[in-house]
């Protein structure tokens, strides 16, 4: 039997895109301060807003008064949210190119954390590199010492 177009039935419905707005934190040009750029993402329910935020941080700002903070070559591998915690996993380039300045290191960490926490369902962030928990980024301690 030959199937015609009207014989084909799709199981499931196409996902409706939803709009998610996040505050992306970039460096204010020429300063050691963070500036905010509001960005709206159109995502389907199966797409991760947290991963979209990380990819936008890596792509850089559209506002001319802001600058990208994350080192070149860094990739966002994944971002999942579980019970208010966002697990953000990056490629090894994040730790291969740590800036010397402690202030710069802190800005990078704050950029990631504050951008992800602008999503209403993210309360805390755990930064990972290639699936391993990052305990510090240069001189910036990310996890308290275990007793």
Name the predicted role of every residue range.
Residues 1-147:
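Bimodal "functional hotspot" detector
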